[in-house]
From Swiss-Prot:
Domain of life where this protein originates: Bacteria
Disulfide bond residue pairs: none
EC number in record: 2.4.2.1, 2.4.2.2
Pfam short name (any one): Ppnp
Name of the protein in question: Pyrimidine/purine nucleoside phosphorylase
Length: 93
């Protein structure tokens, strides 16, 4: 079953699904600044574009481009800066 979600006045959209009992979502972010909260740990992979992020444990902003990924702890939040339309894959760990 697919679950379609929209955030930040439709500037971030995702489609969620399950694979082998693991929750996954794939989506697109339009340019902007966003703050996301996490319930579970997440692995975010950038499919195309770039995400500049700052987790609560990061001293500085870090940019991840196409083909790169990063992890975020559960029960935390992270800030995201998007300068170009970016597609991502999120795996909930």
């Amino acid at each position: 079953m697919l679950t379609v979600n929209s955030y930040f006045e439709d500037k971030v959209k995702s489609i969620g699904f399950e694979q082998n009992s693991n929750a996954i979502s794939v989506g697109v972010m339009l340019p902007g600044n966003y703050t996301f909260g996490t319930a579970a740990a997440e692995k975010m992979s950038v499919i195309t574009g770039a995400l500049t992020i700052k987790r609560s444990t990061d001293a500085d902003w870090v940019t991840f481009s196409s083909g790169e990924d990063f992890s975020v702890e559960g029960n935390s939040s992270f800030e995201v800066k998007v300068e170009i339309e970016t597609a991502y894959l999120c795996e909930y760990l």
